[in-house]
């Protein structure tokens, strides 16, 4: 049986202390813009002010193939998924390069790649070889859906138990943006043309095929709404179902998480329904150029940290955002207050602003 423990809220006392400390630092109030809000969020997640710099940031890339990819909805053949899993494991993918400079390590997990697992470690949570063609059939069976969601829960637990203090969800799978578009359209009541983008670089004919596949899948999923598990069974696939479980369980475990592009954020939309309130533990790493991503972010009430017109997936946008998040933590933790630095404050209300006391767990 699929179930998640209740999601608690980030710590309000640490949030208030962090906001007060931001206002006491040697700068005009609000001068660091969104960095201030991000630092306050980290403090509330860590239950301490000032917050600690992240020591074990971890990227998990969830890999899986989608039967709909054989309908001409991608510019790349399905076998690229297995090849890219090997590339990520070898350290040669974009996510490896960006995670390295961001101070994070990378794990790839095969949930439904249409090939034998590259290794026992990578395939430890494999559910099946490839997910069904969602335009004509369910992506998964009931048991497979439960297994995939549980796999995501277990992977989150494994990472948190091993000491991860920030998680990034990434994706790898030819055809996964088609499945993601269905999830977003179903949960935001959007038309297929509003959520379908050009993915890996398809042409206009490919876009038309992709839109038709999303339309057909939406017709199939309407009867199961608003059931999130039923939606994942019909149209998600094992990789997206696992991402949903991962994002939900990260929140249950009070661990901050950065979302990546449209595939991850679509799964997060479902995760919010599996574990209400989970979104408070997430930040949107970036805004993808995929049109459905903006709709999904709006539905979650999340603003992207960066907007660099990226559309790769893998966790790359979130890895870039991690560098910004680290800067936010550093500013709140390392800057001096007006009192500490002996710097005069701007006199507005005649009140001398001093640093608030530290808050520890």
Swiss-Prot record:
Q: Does the keyword NADP apply?
A: no
HAMAP family in the record: CobT
Spell out the reaction equation it catalyses: 5,6-dimethylbenzimidazole + nicotinate beta-D-ribonucleotide = alpha-ribazole 5'-phosphate + nicotinate + H(+)
Q: Which gene encodes it?
A: cobT
Instruction: Cite the EC number.
Output: 2.4.2.21
Specify the protein name.
Nicotinate-nucleotide--dimethylbenzimidazole phosphoribosyltransferase
Q: Which GO terms describe its biological process?
A: cobalamin biosynthetic process
Task: Give the organism's phylogenetic lineage.
Answer: Bacteria, Bacillati, Actinomycetota, Actinomycetes, Mycobacteriales
Query: What is the enzyme's main class?
Result: transferase
Question: What is this protein for, i.e. what is its function?
Answer: Catalyzes the synthesis of alpha-ribazole-5'-phosphate from nicotinate mononucleotide (NAMN) and 5,6-dimethylbenzimidazole (DMB).
According to UniProt, this protein's pathway is: Nucleoside biosynthesis; alpha-ribazole biosynthesis; alpha-ribazole from 5,6-dimethylbenzimidazole: step 1/2
Keywords, sorted A to Z: Cobalamin biosynthesis, Glycosyltransferase, Transferase
PANTHER family of this UniProt entry?
NICOTINATE-NUCLEOTIDE--DIMETHYLBENZIMIDAZOLE PHOSPHORIBOSYLTRANSFERASE
**What family does this belong to?**
Belongs to the CobT family.
Organism, by scientific name, is Mycobacterium tuberculosis (strain ATCC 25177 / H37Ra)
- The active site is formed by 314 (proton acceptor)
The answer to keyword Repressor applying to this record is: no
Q: Which InterPro entries match?
A: Nict_dMeBzImd_PRibTrfase, Nict_dMeBzImd_PRibTrfase_bact, Nict_dMeBzImd_PRibTrfase_N, Nict_dMeBzImd_PRibTrfase_sf
Q: Which domain of life is it from?
A: Bacteria
Instruction: Give this protein's Gene Ontology molecular function annotations.
Output: nicotinate-nucleotide-dimethylbenzimidazole phosphoribosyltransferase activity
Q: Which Pfam families match?
A: DBI_PRT
């Amino acid at each position: 049986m699929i179930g998640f423990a209740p999601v608690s809220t980030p710590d309000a006392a640490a949030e208030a202390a962090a906001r007060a400390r931001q206002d006491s630092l040697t700068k005009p109030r609000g001068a660091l813009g969104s960095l201030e809000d991000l630092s306050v969020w980290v403090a509330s997640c860590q239950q301490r002010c000032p917050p600690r710099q992240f020591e074990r940031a971890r990227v998990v890339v969830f890999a899986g193939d989608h039967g709909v990819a054989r309908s001409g909805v991608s510019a790349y053949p399905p076998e690229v998924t297995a090849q890219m899993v090997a590339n990520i494991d070898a350290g040669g993918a974009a996510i490896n390069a960006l995670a390295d400079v961001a101070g994070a390590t990378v794990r790839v997990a095969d949930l439904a790649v249409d090939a034998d697992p590259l290794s026992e470690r990578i395939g430890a949570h494999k559910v099946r070889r490839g997910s069904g063609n969602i335009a004509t059939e369910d992506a998964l069976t009931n048991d497979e859906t439960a297994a995939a969601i549980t796999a995501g829960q277990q992977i989150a637990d494994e990472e948190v138990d091993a000491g991860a203090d920030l998680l990034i969800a990434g994706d790898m799978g030819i055809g996964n943006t088609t499945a993601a578009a269905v999830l977003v359209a179903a949960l935001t009541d959007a038309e297929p043309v509003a959520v379908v983008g050009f993915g890996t670089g398809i042409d206009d004919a490919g876009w038309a095929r992709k839109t038709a596949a999303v339309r057909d899948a939406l017709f199939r999923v309407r009867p199961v709404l608003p059931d999130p598990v039923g939606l994942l069974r019909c149209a998600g696939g094992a990789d997206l179902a696992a991402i949903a479980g991962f994002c939900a369980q990260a929140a249950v475990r009070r661990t901050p998480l950065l979302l990546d592009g449209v595939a991850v954020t679509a799964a997060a939309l479902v995760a919010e329904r599996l574990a209400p309130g989970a979104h408070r533990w997430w930040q949107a790493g970036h805004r993808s150029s995929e049109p459905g991503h903006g709709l999904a972010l709006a539905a979650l009430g999340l603003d992207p940290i960066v907007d660099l017109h990226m559309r790769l997936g893998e966790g790359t946008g979130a890895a870039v955002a991690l560098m910004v998040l680290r800067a936010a933590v550093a500013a709140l933790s390392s800057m001096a207050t007006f009192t500490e630095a002996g710097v005069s404050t701007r006199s507005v209300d005649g009140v001398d602003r001093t640093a608030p006391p530290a808050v520890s767990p």
